[in-house]
Amino acid sequence: MTDSTIRIAIVGAGGRMGRQLIQAVTQMEGVVLGAAIERKGSTLVGSDAGELAGVGLLNVIVGDDLSQLTDNFDVLIDFTRPEGTLEHLAICRQHRKAMVIGTTGFDEAGKAAISEAAADIGIVFAANFSVGVNVVLKLLEKAAKVMGDYTDIEIIEAHHRHKVDAPSGTALAMGEAIADAMGRSLKDCAVYSREGYTGERKPGTIGFATVRAGDIVGEHTAMFADIGERVEITHKATSRMTFAHGAVKSAIWLGKHDNGLFDMRDVLNLNEL
């Protein structure tokens, strides 16, 4: 990929996140919207992507077949669903197009497919593209190393009523950051639900609680609770635009990488801290 203006394609262009991504592209330097894609049969196919997102005419017509638009973009941004993202991944890999993946809810096979594709193309794959959330992940690593062994750890997350996966990808990323810092596997210590007679809390576990209500953009709290005190590290998002700007920033950053699997901590250089 060259250092010239990067052409962005957005799938799910008519959705809440898709429209925010289109807006973000128009607000940031070094990028232009090259393609916009919606699902086959959508009434939005054929409309102008800029008018769809409320930013005026962009002369980019919403299409429904990514494979026919690969000459129009350098980086694909995908915040859709796992099955769709994996289809787009195969197309991008075939045509050597980079990807920014914000889709959550992948199973192990899906994650493996992303890792394999990164041998050929550059991919930024993150549960959350907010700068603040990724700073929180770094803080959680530090807190877990100091307090993790003697505190009860709980992660509470809340999202809007339309979110289809639980716990959120961000909540799982928080759990993984904590578990990794303590030398554990999240698979072995996560507790995802409690109901009925559960007995006392088992030491060394990481609990998850989920709220789905209203129009909550995203709220996440990690709690380290001891007798007499507790530490809570919280992030609250009030607009999807924070995720959109992070995703576009990642696309720009990918311009310097022909292949490899990265996350937002790489983009923000947080791994050096």
From Swiss-Prot:
The active site is at H159, K163. InterPro entries: DapB_C, DapB_N, DapB_N_CS, DHDPR_bac, NAD(P)-bd_dom_sf. (S)-2,3,4,5-tetrahydrodipicolinate binds at H160, G169, T170. Pfam families: DapB_C, DapB_N. Its EC number is 1.17.1.8. Pathway: Amino-acid biosynthesis; L-lysine biosynthesis via DAP pathway; (S)-tetrahydrodipicolinate from L-aspartate: step 4/4. GO terms for molecular function: 4-hydroxy-tetrahydrodipicolinate reductase; NAD binding; NADP binding; oxidoreductase activity, acting on CH or CH2 groups, NAD or NADP as acceptor. It is found in: Cytoplasm. One of its GO terms (biological process) is diaminopimelate biosynthetic process. Keywords: Amino-acid biosynthesis, Cytoplasm, Diaminopimelate biosynthesis, Lysine biosynthesis, NAD, NADP, Oxidoreductase. SUPFAM superfamilies: Glyceraldehyde-3-phosphate dehydrogenase-like, C-terminal domain (SSF55347), NAD(P)-binding Rossmann-fold domains (SSF51735). NAD(+) binds at G12, A13, G14, G15, R16, M17, E38, G102, T103, T104, A126, A127, N128, F129. The keyword Oxidoreductase applies. It catalyses: (S)-2,3,4,5-tetrahydrodipicolinate + NAD(+) + H2O = (2S,4S)-4-hydroxy-2,3,4,5-tetrahydrodipicolinate + NADH + H(+); (S)-2,3,4,5-tetrahydrodipicolinate + NADP(+) + H2O = (2S,4S)-4-hydroxy-2,3,4,5-tetrahydrodipicolinate + NADPH + H(+). Belongs to the DapB family. Catalyzes the conversion of 4-hydroxy-tetrahydrodipicolinate (HTPA) to tetrahydrodipicolinate. Homotetramer. This is 4-hydroxy-tetrahydrodipicolinate reductase. It comes from Yersinia pestis.
